[in-house]
Amino acid sequence: MLDVNNFEYMKIGLASPDKIRSWSFGEVKKPETINYRTLKPERDGLFCERIFGPTKDWECSCGKYKRVRYKGVVCDRCGVEVTKSKVRRERMGHIELAAPVSHIWYFKGIPSRMGLVLDMSPRALEEVIYFASYVVTEAGDTALDKKQLLSEREYRAYREKYGQSFQAGMGAEAIKRLLDAVDLEGEVTELKEELKSAQGQRRTRAIRRLEVLEAFRHSGNKPSWMVLDVLPVIPPEIRPMVQLEGGRFATSDLNDLYRRVINRNNRLKRLLDLGAPSIIVQNEKRMLQEAVDGLIDNGRRGRPVTGPGNRPLKSLSHMLKGKQGRFRQNLLGKRVDYSGRSVIVCGPSLKMYQCGLPREMAIELFKPFVMRELTQRGLAHNIKSAKRKIERHSPEIWDVLEDVIREHPVLLNRAPTLHRLGIQAFEPILVEGRAIRLHPLVCTAYNADFDGDQMAVHVPLSPEAQAEARILMLAANHILNPKDGKPVVTPSQDMVLGNYYLTLERENIVGEGLVFTDINEAMIAYQNGYVHLHSRVAVAAASLGNETFTAEQNNQLLITTVGKMIFNSILPPSFPYLNEPTKTNLEVATPSQYFVPTTTDVKAHIEKQAFLLPFKKKNLEEIIAQIFKLFHITETSKMLDRMKDQGFKYSTLAGITVGISDIIVVKDKPEILAASHDEVDNVTKMFKRGLMTDEERYERVIAIWNAAKDQLQNKLIAGLDRLNPIFMMQDSGARGNISNFTQLAGMRGLMADPSGRIVELPITSNFREGLNVLEYFISSHGARKGLTDTALKTADSGYLTRRLVDVAQDVIVRETNDGSDHGLLVSDIVEGPEVIETLTERLEGRYSAKTVRHPETNEVMIRPDELFTQEIAEAIPAAGIKEVWIRSVFTCNTKHGVSKISYGKDLSTGSEVEVGEAVGIVAAQSIGEPGTQLTMRTFHTGGVAGSDITQGLPRIQEIFEARNPKGHAVITELTGEVKAIEEKANRQREITVTGTQETRTYTVPMVARLKVKVGDAVRRGDPLMDGSIDPKELLHVTDVITVENYLLGEVQK
C-alpha cells in the first residue's frame, strides 16, 4: 500500500485496459442507480453494493450478516463483502466497451497527441473517429497510401476495383489498428534523420512529433492505449445520489453521463449480437464515442450534453479545472479547523502586538488546549468531562482559558489578502461581546475600516507554527512596507488630527510669553487654564533632559508651545526635540534660533518670530521612519502606541466637528462666474466667425472653466481660518483634500459624461447652495462610473497578481555574490516636468557596480559591490553626478534566482536581504497590491481618437503581457536628426530622420502630439510622438538593456 501522506511527486500516465480491469471490483452492466421503492442500490448498476461495497458499516445487502465479527465475509445470498462503508469512496468499477473509443484528451488536446504520433491532421482524425470517412489501415499491393482518407463513395469504388487486397476502416477501431502498427524506434530514427535537413514548418512539426514519440518510448506507455476498450467507473461516494426532503433525488452530473454511456453501450452490444446493418451499428458506435467524450470532457467537441434547464453537465475534466475545480478549490485552498470569523471594531487601548478575541470564539478555538489543561489541573477527571464542562460554560474554564491563550499568538486575515501584510499574528486578549478588536494602526496594512468589515482568525497549533507566527508574523515587527520600505503603520484620521492640533501655534492667546521651569509646571498651568496648548512659551532647556542639546543650549530657554512639549514627551530622549517640521530638525538637531538667553524679554521675542507649521501626516511618517532607522523595531512600536494614544486623546479634547457654518462662502463668486461666462461667449463668437475649429473651441471652454474653479479655490484658501475644522482635516492629511472643500464651498466644476468626455457645461453650484436638477443629472454619470469601475477593477487586479506570482514564485535569493561584472546605469526617472523617482531613491539600498569618484576632488565615493547608504546616495547627486552604474537583478548571473548583491537590501527590514528570501513573490505582491487603487479608465484628451493613451491597471497588464499597446508611439530606427515634418493628405504627417548613412521617413497621425521638432537630435529607439512604445519593436531596434529600462520606467509610473 502506498503511503498517501509521504510522496515526492505524482506521475500521470496512460492506463492500459488490463490496468483499468485490475483497479475494478466488477463490471457495471446496467444504467440503474437506486430502486425507487426500497431505496437500495440496484444490482450490477452504478451504485451496486456487490461491486463497490456495502452502504452500511459491517452489513451485507440482504441483511444475512450483520456486526463486525463477520468482517471480510462475502455473503452467499447477495455477494456483498461485509466491511466498512468507507470503501465506497475507494472501490472502482469498469464498463467493457462494445467498440473501442478514442480518449478526447489525446485526440482533441492542443497539440493533438494522437495526431502527432500518427502524423495525421486533427481534422482527418475527427473525420475517421466520428464515422465520416474511411482510413486505409493496410494498403496491400494497391495504389492506395496507408492513412489515406476515403469517402463512402470512393471506398465502394476501390472495394469493387481491388476486392479484399486492402483494408480500410472507420471509427476508433481503425485508429487503434494504426496506433498498434506504429514502430516507435523506427519513427524516432527517421525523425532524427529528417531534422538534419528539414527547415521551417516541417522542422517544427518534426520536433513536436519527436517530443511525443520519445515520451512514449521513455514512459513505456503504448500509443494504442490512447484508445479506450475499458472505461473506469469512479467510486459511487465521489458521485453521490442523495434524497432531498419531498422525496426527490439530487445526483451528481457524472451519474447522468455514465448512464448515457451504459445505455448506448448495451444497445450497441445488442445490435452487434443481432447482426444489424452496418449503417445502424456505425451510428450507434458514433453515439457511444460522443457519450464517452461527454463523460470525460463535456463541451470540448460539439454541443455540450445538457441537463434540465439547458445547463451543461459537469464532466470529469470540469471537476479538476479552474477555480472551482478539485485543485484550486480543495487541494491548494481548504477550509481549515481552528478558525473563525467576526466583525472587527476598533481597540484603541491595545498594544501593537495585541488583538481582542471574543470569549465565546476563543473557548471554541482553543478547546483542545483548554481540555488538556483542565484534566492536568484535576478540574476534570477525563477529556469527556472536560468537554462537557466547556459546553456548559462552567465558571472555572475562563481562568484556564486565560492561561492557555497567554503567549499563544493567533493569525488575523482580512480578505482580499493582496500582500503579505494581509495576514499578521497577534497575541489574543479576551474581550466581552462578539466582535474582534483590532489595533487601529494596523488598519492601513489590512486596508480595513470599522464600517462592518469582517476578519478571520486562525490558530497556529504546533509549537513550530507558533514560533514562526511570533518571530516572522507578529504585527509589531511589520512596521515597514515590503514594497517601498516606508512605514506602513502610520497614524491615520483621528490620530493625525490630534497630533496636528497638538502642534499648532496661534498668536495673542492666553499665557503667551510665559516662562516655565519645566514641563510639569507648564502642564499644571495648562490644566488650570492659565495657558493654552497653542500658546508660544519659553521653558528651561535643561529641564527637558534631551540628550541632543549642547551644553550652551542647556543653559538657555527654548521657545516652543505647550502642545509641542507634550508631543515631544513620547519621543526617546536621544532624539532631537522637534520644534519645526523640517528635515534639519528631524535628522540633525533642534535649530539654535529657538534658544534664547535666560535674560531675554520672551514676550517681545515671540512677537517678532514667525509662526511654525504644525506636524502633518507626512511629517509623522518621516518621524516614524527616522525612529526606525535609529532605534529599530521594539522602540518604534512602543513609540507608535504612544503616538496613537496621544492622537486619540487630543483629537477628542480638541472637539473638532463639522457643521454647515464651517463651510464659508466666497464673496466674489458671482463676479468670477460672470467673467468666465463672458470669456466663453467670446470664444463662441470667434468659433462662429470661423476663427477656430470646434475642437479648439471645446479645449478653450474647458480651460476657462478649470481656471475659474482654480481661482475660486485660491480665494477660498486665502479666506480660510487656520482653525477651520474642515481645513484642519484636509491640511493635516487626516481626511479629504482641497478639492472636496472646493466642491462644498466653491463650485463643483466640470464633469465627465459616460464615455469619459468632459461635458463643457460646468456645475457652478456648490454643495452648500445645492445643485439644480440638470447639474444633479450631469454629476450622476461620474458617480455611477466610479462605482462600476471599482467593482470591475478589483477582479482584474486580483487576476493580475495571480499571474505575476505564477511567473515570479521561483525567484529566490540563492547566493551572496554572482560575480557579474556589469550592471544597470540609473538616473532620475522623469515624465515631462515631474520627477517620478529621484536618483537618490533609486540608489539607496542597492550595491554599486563600478567605482564612483567625486567629479571635482577625484576621491573615491564608493567601490564596486559596496552598499549605497542613505548618506552616500544623497552625496552623489549633490556632487553633480547624474547617472551611476548599480548592480541589478536584470544583469544577475545567478541560476534560478538572484544574488544578495544584485537585489540590494530587504525593504521590509531595512537590513541586508537573507539568502532564501522569496523576493519574486514580494515583487509580484508589491505590484499587484496597489493595482486595486489604479484607475480603470482610458484617458480621453477631449475624446479625440488616436490620442487616447491607456493608463492605470490596463496599462500595467499591457506591459506585463508585452501586448501591442493601444495608442502606440512611432519610434525611430536611426540615430541622427529630424530634418523635416510635413503634413500629408488623409490627416497624416511625415517625419524625416537623417542618420549618418541613410534617411528614413515615418508617418504619424495628425492628431498625435509630437515629441520632436525640426533640428532635434534623436537616438535609436526614441519615440517621435506621445504614447506607449511597443516593447517588441524597441527590442528589434535597440538592445535588451534599453527595453528593460523602458519597461521599468513605465511600471514605476
UniProtKB/Swiss-Prot annotation:
UniProt-annotated binding residues for Zn(2+): C60, C62, C75, C78
Cofactors that this protein relies on: Mg(2+); Zn(2+)
EC numbers, comma separated: 2.7.7.6
Source organism, top-level taxon: Bacteria
Sorted UniProt keywords: DNA-directed RNA polymerase, Magnesium, Metal-binding, Nucleotidyltransferase, Transcription, Transferase, Zinc
Cofactor note: Binds 1 Mg(2+) ion per subunit.
UniProt binding sites for Mg(2+): D449, D451, D453
Catalytic EC class: transferase
GO CC aspect terms: DNA-directed RNA polymerase complex
NCBIfam families named among the record's database cross-references: rpoC_TIGR (TIGR02386)
Stated role: DNA-dependent RNA polymerase catalyzes the transcription of DNA into RNA using the four ribonucleoside triphosphates as substrates.
Family: Belongs to the RNA polymerase beta' chain family.
Designated name of the protein: DNA-directed RNA polymerase subunit beta'
Source organism per UniProt: Brochothrix thermosphacta (Microbacterium thermosphactum)
Source species taxonomy: Bacteria, Bacillati, Bacillota, Bacilli, Bacillales
